[in-house]
Amino acid sequence: MADPQTVLARRVQSALGAAFGPEYRDTDPVIRPSQFADFQANVALALAKRLRRSPRDVATAITEHLDISDVCSKVEISGPGFINLTLRDDWIAHQVHDLLTDERLGTPVQESQNIPIDYSAPNVAKEMHVGHLRTTVVGDALARILEFLGHHVIRQNHIGDWGTPFGMLIEHLLEVGEDSAEAAQLKSDPNAFYQAARAKFDSDEDFADRARRRVVALQSGDAETLRLWRDLIELSKIYFNRIYRKLDVTLTDAHLAGESTYNDMLGPVCDELAEKGLAVVSDGALCVFLEGFTGREGKPVPLIIRKSDGGYGYATTDLATIKYRVEQLKADRIIYVVGAPQSLHLRMVYETARQAGWLGNAEPIHVQIGNVLGSDGKILRTRSGAPVRLMALLDEAVERASAVVAQTRPDLDEETRAAIARDVGIGAVKYADLSIAHDTEYVFDFDRMLALNGNTGPYLQYAVARIRSIFRKGGIDPAQVTGPIQVTEPAERALALKLLDFGATVVQVGDTLEPHRLCTYLFDLAQTFTAFYEACPVLKADRDEVRNSRLALTAVTLHTLVKGLDLLGVRAPEQM
């Protein structure tokens, strides 16, 4: 089964080849939804100048060669040369009926690519805050969607596990004891551990000296220092995984690829760039200067790959990372789900890698993540000005959802209410994040997120629960519904057409890397189903064939909403 626009495009392209020659067969037929029909082909206007004919003459020639009577009930030319295409009701019904037994719901399997996706990337011994929410949620949704489309997705959690702060962290760990309550803070409140280490570093010169020496020992590979460093990472992993389980994302320890992974590559990367003449010494530092990257006064902006003291920075690690992902992971696309402020840095890294010849045919892509704002329009922070702790935010979401569930469903047992609150609270936060274009900022608002109306997670979860209740009320298993489907009422037709858009929407998200498009589709589908349910009785339909058809449309809607939410990483509770 193909979506209507794809079917129509192929037929119009065949007509183009027949009417004007094979060289026109691959022309974009410009199929768009129409207010006067189901779709319209606008290609005649685009071809008129090239063919030196009026758009209407071009449209007439296309329709004369258009073999489409099995798909369309009406083909009309309107205006200057629009070709209006109205689909046959029986064709629509047949296509939707096929979805009943199609687990992919019309989504094609694409030619597989190797796609590393770099997302989440928290720092060892530091709390994950609200700034980590969007990269984690958006990155995970993209990973799920691209896998569903048939790609080999390689999740890469580029944690901050190296650098000068580890000197003070290791020394603090030694002072408090590896088995102490203070060390255990790394599992639940890593900021407390980090801040205690920082306070000692700032106030105790002897401690600061030991911390600096410990950094040297770490970088030189001292065995005991490396053991302590690994302990810090192991304790932090426990904390990371608590967050990931709470958020219901697919990241595991197997996906960790921290900064330290690439340590052995940093020197060779600098040497190779210098040998190729891309890197030069400037003020004692080894830098790459790229054409087109200038500051406010027109001065070249350097990409510093080795500092004047011989140390390496983020740029060096990022260059080593991209080299590794192309050469070792055989990447076709490399997706970086990273904050928008990193745009300049990443563009310079990509261009350096390209000029060094490391990219080959691989395409690096920056999925820019906008900031999460408070009600004052500024970056969301606590009253004290600190970043909002992600775990605290998620706990509050579940608590708020729990209060609503307790009020609306006192008939349910406590365990069931807790499960619903968890799914609704976490789902609301994730969906709010995903429903807005990833590169835009948005205001974090619990009331809006948890609302049962509008384009929200709870609205869609409620739509799913409502549909499931229809089948429970009828004593029917939606997986056993067989139809056949007939499309006679306008509301049935509108729902059927919307269901046929799912596969094309998923493909579009995979191409654009914009999950909010799937959110918009699911919201539209839920609204279209509501209109259908109000206009077309399902369980109380007056004839068996009508009842069976509407049950089939309802079953496909249920499967589509559940699959769509699953691709976004949002659970759909059995009841609300």
Swiss-Prot record:
Q: Which reaction does it catalyse?
A: tRNA(Arg) + L-arginine + ATP = L-arginyl-tRNA(Arg) + AMP + diphosphate
Where the record places motif 'HIGH' region is 122-132
Q: Which Pfam families match?
A: Arg_tRNA_synt_N, DALR_1, tRNA-synt_1d
> Which PROSITE patterns does this chain map to?
AA_TRNA_LIGASE_I
Record keywords: Aminoacyl-tRNA synthetase, ATP-binding, Cytoplasm, Ligase, Nucleotide-binding, Protein biosynthesis
Q: Which GO terms describe its molecular function?
A: arginine-tRNA ligase activity; ATP binding
Q: Where is the signal peptide?
A: none
Superkingdom is: Bacteria
- Asked if the Swiss-Prot or TrEMBL record annotates the protein with the keyword Ligase, the reply is yes
Q: Which InterPro entries match?
A: aa-tRNA-synth_I_CS, Arg-tRNA-ligase, Arg-tRNA-synth_N, Arg-tRNA-synth_N_sf, ArgRS_core, DALR_anticod-bd, Rossmann-like_a/b/a_fold, tRNAsynth_Ia_anticodon-bd
Primary residence: cytoplasm
Q: What Gene Ontology cellular component terms go with this record?
A: cytoplasm
Q: Name one GO biological process term.
A: arginyl-tRNA aminoacylation
Q: Which residues form a coiled coil?
A: none
Q: Does the keyword Aminoacyl-tRNA synthetase apply?
A: yes
Q: Where in the cell is it found?
A: Cytoplasm
Tell me its EC number(s), please. 6.1.1.19
NCBIfam families reported in the protein's UniProt record: argS
Q: How does it assemble?
A: Monomer.
By its UniProt entry, which PANTHER family does this protein fall under? ARGININE--TRNA LIGASE, CYTOPLASMIC, ARGINYL-TRNA SYNTHETASE
Query: What name does the UniProt record give this protein?
Result: Arginine--tRNA ligase
